Amino acid sequence: GLAMAWAVLGPLLWGCALALQGGMLYPRESQSRERKELDGLWSFRADFSDNRRRGFEEQWYRRPLRESGPTLDMPVPSSFNDISQDWRLRHFVGWVWYEREVILPERWTQDLSTRVVLRIGSAHAYAIVWVNGVHTLEHEGGYLPFEADISNLVQVGPLSSHVRITIAINNTLTSTTLPPGTIQYLTDISKYPKGYFIQNTYFDFFNYAGLQRSVLLYTTPTAYIDDITVTTGVEHDTGLVNYQISVKGSNLFELEVRLLDAENKLVANGTGIQGQLKVPGARLWWPYLMHERPAYLYSLEVRLTAQTSLGPVSDFYTLPVGIRTVAVTESQFLINGKPFYFHGVNKHEDADIRGKGFDWPLLVKDFNLLRWLGANAFRTSHYPYAEEVLQMCDRYGIVVIDECPGVGLALPQFFNNVSLQNHMRVMEEVVRRDKNHPAVVMWSVANEPASHLESAGYYLKMVITHTKALDPSRPVTFVTNSNYAADKGAPYVDVICLNSYYSWYHDYGHLELIQRQLTTQFENWYKTYQKPIIQSEYGAETIVGFHQDPPLMFTEEYQKSLLEQYHVVLDQKRRKYVVGELIWNFADFMTEQSPTRVLGNKKGVFTRQRQPKSAAFLLRERYWKIANETRYPHSIAKSQCLENSPFT
């Protein structure tokens, strides 16, 4: 029934799903573009009314927020949950209101050949934006950017330099959001007040919300470079850079494209909206610890000259480009034709006080820890991370499995037509934003969905097929914890990603069973699918400072012993068809409260404050040993980051 209905709908969905208008280039400054950051303190107010609709009924967006009632100072970027001492805000579900007043430079408001854009890095989960009380933009889904041209609202007269931006954000998760959730009304009035409800989620991290990434204004000319798509290839020692450029605001234009190397020397140039640049003797983009000069980046400089009704304009945009190839065989993952082994981590965007708020000191610390560990990869579990994170990966050579917020797809009712269409749109937004990052080598469309369900099989097939159509240049996967014989989505992936928690959630305490159970799992999956396998999660909850020998659960010794048991099997299988291992997790992180979570998930090899547990040293020794093996050229580990290696 369900599959049949979908089979009929399939072509319709397909036709309307490629619906995204325009590009989402990262806002960079250039000769023709300016940025004005709106990070800092915003006015904030949560709507605590029973129906959460008071802000709309009283039209809080029509005048300054402080006139509607008491407001708080709220830092942006940050989650709002951990900032105040109000327990209601910590657990709030519903609409919150943010507001910021800014003064624009006159050249933005008076020069009609300037286009002014408001960009929001992310707002979790549904956002409505007003500028000077005028409804401007709505966006569904956290973790991804959205923007609006607000020129006609700010170029309207002598007082137009004063701009008031109001953003209402709702963090409620329903059966059609990504991630999904359910709202449960508790009606037993002997226990609960009237109208009492809770938000149920089906994933293991705290549902932080707010303006968690930067908000900014930027300008372009009225005719502008709207999007650039780059794919790269290698023929012998010549690098190939294929580009496609879209221009908006003019039909009369010329494009010049220049490719510069890291020393700013011109290595190739071209013209027009698409073409191929050839780079003889190209320096390839290699992962960290795979080459003595990893992460080599070129710059693609695009120059637009266009005719508009107001006369000629020019626009400039520079895109970092890494020349590299990715391929998958039945037992290997190849980067630039060489076998690549993922030795890395799963992460979360999570820290004390700021929650999921973007933070430069934290980001740089995390990258220093990744390099210290000898990690060459991570997965963006379980949502796309901030754009600045991926830019760091490009620069440091850290390989990324880029995951969308398809987590917690645990119930049959979550696999419906509306969700499917929403999921496909989200994949379009992810690919549109992240397609040009050389560090991104694979898309992940979901984490631990209920993939044994018939409806899930069709759903995953549609999302994966759609993602491959959006970007044929990268493999696509989802991360499974289903049984190999029951998984309905696995036939459609390029790489099998397996989560398993032997002797933690299953046969807990029995470390002696891990080798047998893990070996059986790998062999069953490989026999069935003949595809490379990544151990995409494994680990143990560890309270720092708990010690016991022989090892007991929750101690540092147990985490180490569990890892060692996994590593015995991983060492046997990585010589065959296992192409990676990602520990769960890089650092401890916050979850919903439950009797099994002691102030969050404690499976990190670092604490939430980024200090090492015993297992971090074990993992570091292993990752550097793998990196130092003979299959990488010998000079590498010596010349690269000597201070990081435990063996120097």
Swiss-Prot record:
Enzyme superclass (EC): hydrolase
Keyword Hydrolase found: yes
Regulation: Inhibited by L-aspartic acid.
Example GO BP: glucuronoside catabolic process
InterPro entries from the UniProt entry: Beta-gal/glucu_dom_sf (IPR036156), Galactose-bd-like_sf (IPR008979), Glyco_hydro_2 (IPR006101), Glyco_hydro_2_AS (IPR023232), Glyco_hydro_2_cat (IPR006103), Glyco_hydro_2_CS (IPR023230), Glyco_hydro_2_Ig-like (IPR006102), Glyco_hydro_2_N (IPR006104)
Active-site residues per Swiss-Prot or TrEMBL entry: 448
Role summary: Plays an important role in the degradation of dermatan and keratan sulfates.
Name under which the protein is recorded: Beta-glucuronidase
Organism for this UniProt entry: Chlorocebus aethiops (Green monkey)
Gene behind this protein: GUSB
